[in-house]
Amino acid sequence: LLTFPGKYWKDLTLAALIFTAVTVWMQRDMLQLTQQADNFVLPGLSTASAAILNPGERTLVYFFAPWCNICKLSIGNLSRLNDELHTVAVALDYKNAQQVATFVGDRELKVPVLLGNSQVAAAYQISVYPSYYVIDGQGKVLGRSAGYSSLAGLLWRTQKI
């Protein structure tokens, strides 16, 4: 067991409380757990149109904007998730498909990227980037989060569900 002077425990506790409060605040407008998520067919960045969700398959849906600095740091973690979870990235709030293609190419993303729109953003209640949902095979929200997530954080959130 690590021992820290009392001051450090107070600092760590305060940091944890602030992190938790910010996370809860960022998720306040997102779809609620067990809520039904809409499935949209969207144009793919490098493929034909595809549905966001695959019926019968658990899916991680990661919403990002190509100008988002936090997205730049965290989106690469999607490529390292295991193959047991269908993963799709949905671009929102972009100028054109080339802007998204440049963003994705610079990060060598290996998951399907779909080009979303304001209707998708409204249906999934996206107000901050990045935002992501874990959705079950019947379209119900199992988990949600917003902001930076490390690979360990993504694995923990997707495996615990």
Where on the chain are the PLM-derived regions?
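Hydrophobic beta-strand anchors of alpha/beta hydrolase catalytic cores
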Residues: L60-V61, T87, Y132
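Structural microenvironment flanking redox-active thiols in thiol-disulfide oxidoreductases
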Residues: K72-R107, G116-A122
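Loop/turn elements at helix/coil->beta-strand transitions in domains of secreted/extracellular proteins
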Residues: G56-R58, D83-H86, V111
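Short active-site neighborhood of thiol/selenol oxidoreductases, capturing the structured segment around
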Residues: S49-K72, L78
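N-terminal targeting signals for export/organelle localization
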Residues: L1-P43, I161
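Short extracytoplasmic/periplasmic juxtamembrane "stem" segments immediately C-terminal to an N-terminal membrane anchor
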Residues: Q35-E57
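Thiol-/selenol-based redox modules, centered on thioredoxin-like
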Residues: I135-I161
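Short, internal strand/loop/helix patches
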Residues: V104-Q138
